[in-house]
């Protein structure tokens, strides 16, 4: 048996030596996942022990984190909008900034019955968080990767439980997607990082997260342009297109929206005061 307090100190020391700023927190999360204990319990109970086998498992997880593998991929879990989502390296890790987009959509469509399309659904965190909070909403999650759709379907069962009928996932690109019924809302967190900037991302991101979910082409706008163009044909008149965008892309994206009969209604800034989301109304 090994004392958790000693394992935490050793794990923190190893990660700190590797330059990981969140070394203590990461060690606590990893040991918590191994021990099946709450983080606060690990911290507060000095005499808490785990088996030698669990201690070895913890050491192996620390070694993975030392190589910059994201915590979410190691423990296969990430909280988003207070909901637990299954995550692996086939899907982008949900970000806090994207929660701002979900909050705004909820504020607009509270107590309504929107039909929602989530383009590039990934883990399903956006569409499932919305459907969880809106009893009468229905939605479609669109995803180009078959492996990623599997993740979204797992999360749909966890989040929606007996209401899984509220969502459908389709394997398709936005260009090839067809729907008989028009949508009230189309929402997308597309790949928007310019190809040349990928190499400048942190090791946690560029070495582990799927390039398909990051690389937006030469100017970062390849997928955004496709989403905007297709949306005017499958969105209801006065419907909302909600896009997450990259730093410095607002003016270009707003012009593309204008050229495709969209009028900007809301802008959302992230925690660094950058324009992160554009919500536009279709006037077509």
Question: Language model features by range: what are they?
Answer:
Residues 97-200:
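Conserved SAM/SAH cofactor-binding pocket of Class I
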Residues 33-107:
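Conserved AdoMet
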Residues 94, 118, 141, 216, ...:
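Conserved SAM-binding loop
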Residues 30, 68, 98, 126, ...:
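Residue-level signal for inorganic ion chemistry
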Residues 192-223:
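Mobile active-site "lid"/loop adjacent to the S-adenosyl-L-methionine
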Residues 218-281:
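Conserved Class I SAM-dependent methyltransferase catalytic core
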Residues 1-58:
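A short N-terminal interaction module
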Residues 15, 156, 160, 231, ...:
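Conserved hydrophobic residues forming the short capping helix/wall of the S-adenosyl-L-methionine
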